[in-house]
Amino acid sequence: MRMHFVVMVMLLPALMMAGSECRSSCRLTNISITVESEECGSCITIDTTACAGLCKTQESVYRSPLMLSYQNTCNFREWTYETYEFKGCPARADSVFTYPVALSCECSKCNSDITDCGALSQQTLSCNAH
């Protein structure tokens, strides 16, 4: 009986570490963005990085109007912008597409001033046929 207890106590930290690695934590992930330019008559798919995953959060069962409640979401901590220039566009067409590239991620309150705080669609979009 004592041997089983010692083995369980020694395995507990290893099991806890394995469990935390198996969760989908907030991290960089590769995504594809489909961009269509009707003016330029072309459609491309851009590969970039974004932030995705779960963040630890707690929601109180009792909701009080005096206590603000928010949940942490997986957000960009640092990012840069890159541009793609469509080829073969008419002279006055807007041929440049600028998109964000995540460099690092963090769990924080979503800032709706700079972020679309809705859920990211899991559907792969494709260009419309002309």
UniProtKB/Swiss-Prot annotation:
A GO cellular component annotation here is: extracellular space
Q: Which Gene3D superfamilies match?
A: Cystine-knot cytokines
Task: Read off the PROSITE patterns from this record.
Answer: GLYCO_HORMONE_BETA_1, GLYCO_HORMONE_BETA_2
Instruction: Kindly state a single biological-process term from the GO annotations of this entry.
Output: G protein-coupled receptor signaling pathway
Keywords assigned by UniProt? Disulfide bond, Glycoprotein, Hormone, Secreted, Signal
Which residue spans adopt a coiled-coil conformation according to this UniProt entry?
Answer: none
Superkingdom, natural source: Eukaryota
Q: Which residues are glycosylated?
A: 30
Q: Where is the secretion signal located?
A: 1-18
S-S bridge residues: 26-74, 40-89, 51-105, 55-107, 110-117
Report if keyword Signal is assigned: yes
Q: GO molecular function of the protein, one example?
A: hormone activity
Location in or out of the cell:
Secreted
This protein's assembly is summarised as: Heterodimer of an alpha and a beta chain.
Q: Which family does it belong to?
A: Belongs to the glycoprotein hormones subunit beta family.
Q: What does this protein do?
A: Involved in gametogenesis and steroidogenesis.
* The protein's name: Gonadotropin subunit beta-1
Q: Which organism is it from?
A: Cyprinus carpio (Common carp)
